[in-house]
Amino acid sequence: MEERRDDLGLIQLRAGKSLLDLVPVTGKLGSAGGAAPGKEGRNLDHFCFRVEPFDAAAIVKQLAQHGIEAGAPAARNGAEGVGPSIYVLDPEGNVVELKGPIQN
């Protein structure tokens, strides 16, 4: 176990270089996501792909050329620390994070 935050209802597990967040739908974080899995809700907040090298402007431009709207680039925490990332939606409405290397 990487980290446990009972106040948030969060357990983080490490698998190699990846970090997996387990959040019960009844906890503080989970209930903020809406209904439990089914027709009205999903069981996934987002998944992440590591992108290196990470050029936010080039990524946003490439996505726009394919009709994909990207969220604003921002520094976010991840499995290896804080680094740049961009959120997009896949064709089924799942949130995908494109994550760059950590910032020193």
Regions found by a protein language model. Give the residues of each.
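Vicinal oxygen chelate
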Residues: 42-95
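Short secondary-structure boundary/capping segments
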Residues: 11-12, 36-39, 77-78
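A short, acidic/glycine-rich surface segment
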Residues: 27-35, 72-73
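Residues that flank catalytic or metal-binding motifs in active/ligand-binding sites
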Residues: 9, 16-18, 40-45, 84
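Conserved catalytic-core motifs of GNAT/GCN5-like acyltransferases
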Residues: 1-6, 74-77, 103
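Core segments of cupin and vicinal oxygen chelate
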Residues: 1-21, 25-29
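A short acidic/small-residue loop/turn micro-motif
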Residues: 27-28, 102-104
